Amino acid sequence: MAKIVKVIGREIIDSRGNPTVEAEVHLEGGFVGLAAAPSGASTGSREALELRDGDKARFLGKGVLKAVAAVNNEIAQALVGKDATNQAEIDQIMIDLDGTENKSKFGANAILAVSLANAKAAAAAKGMPLFAWIAELNGTPGQYSMPLPMMNIINGGEHADNNVDIQEFMIQPVGAKTLKEALRIGAEVFHNLAKVLKGKGLSTAVGDEGGFAPNLESNAAALACIKEAVEKAGYVLGKDVTLAMDCASSEFYNKENGMYEMKGEGKSFTSQEFTHYLEELCKEYPIVSIEDGQDESDWEGFAYQTKVLGDKVQLVGDDLFVTNTKILKEGIEKGIANSILIKFNQIGSLTETLAAIKMAKDAGYTAVISHRSGETEDATIADLAVGTAAGQIKTGSMSRSDRIAKYNQLIRIEEALGDKAPFLGLKAVKGQA
């Protein structure tokens, strides 16, 4: 038994200068797990609650001392003496103790930090890497793959202070044979994109996720800049590198009139028109994945989009599904989208995250492991992607060490596993196998 002897919570700072919760779980034998909760900017309305203090005199109201107090008091008291290797029990104790539907008593940020720290401590006690322990918890011991990176190299929407409506324009280095080679291709395209933007007199300042955030006349202009950068780097768009977008449509959906209002372009679309707008972009560019291509509440729009694009494009639900098995189950039954974005803190525990990944895979949906726009140096999502053989990861661009920490962890894991963790490339993307 790997008995928990101490649980510690503290307030640390994330990549946006906001506080977040870090937790330590100490076991008998001196084993320790350390983990921090990330934080989102464009959030789904049905996400588990991130508890903030609301005290405007501290961190503009964004302090997390209440969540930290929950870790150091109620959660610590409930977990001391328990077996850290029983992850499902540890998570359930915290969920039951919180007692709310959306973890609003303690905060998903408190519960998640402890959940992940516990998994790390248990892995240490077992003498195995975190990815291997996650595979055991997932019921798939020894089954690994290296994920295809979806690298957000132009940021818009809530992730940047510019006029671009679509939140993320991503590249996928599908021509690579290994994860390490994929990162090299991504870095080369990223540096060439800087040259392209500078050549047009555009800003090369970066957004929250490390991508460039220039003012552009249209979303198509962002794709055109990326195409030029790919070619300048010596690669073929559609063969070596494919494209993906996160529309984050809820951010520009007008609930009052049911229109998608893209202020940056001065365009307004009905739900079906917006699907056809995206369809035209897919015809012009090799876009193989679109995330949140409709508002999270527009299930009728999603059903239509899935009918029109679902057989050739991966349609990822983020705000749509919020890593929640109840919502995902309904989506699967109604044929909504064909992929889910996986964010730990949308649901608030490792056990529930693994359940969402399993449900998606069992239904033939893909699962894309994702960071949040507010991150720390915690690289747990790298181990999650490998340990669940998810096949795809979104963890930002080729700048900002809060993003690079995850890529560097993937490099280490690939080196350790060798051919036991194949890099699937484009085969990992729904509709592209």
Swiss-Prot record:
Active site: residue positions: 209 (proton donor), 343 (proton acceptor)
UniProtKB keywords: Cytoplasm, Glycolysis, Lyase, Magnesium, Metal-binding, Secreted
Pfam families linked: Enolase_C, Enolase_N
Biological role: Catalyzes the reversible conversion of 2-phosphoglycerate (2-PG) into phosphoenolpyruvate (PEP). It is essential for the degradation of carbohydrates via glycolysis.
Underlying gene: eno
Protein's organism: Pasteurella multocida (strain Pm70)
EC number of the protein: 4.2.1.11
Residues that coordinate or bind Mg(2+): 246, 291, 318
GO biological process terms, semicolon-separated: glycolytic process
Broad class of where this protein is predominantly found: cytoplasm
HAMAP family in UniProt: Enolase (MF_00318)
GO molecular function per UniProt: magnesium ion binding; phosphopyruvate hydratase activity
Description of how the protein assembles with itself and partners: Component of the RNA degradosome, a multiprotein complex involved in RNA processing and mRNA degradation.
UniProt: (2R)-2-phosphoglycerate binding residues: 167, 343, 372-373, 394
Protein location: Cytoplasm; Secreted; Cell surface
Record's protein name: Enolase
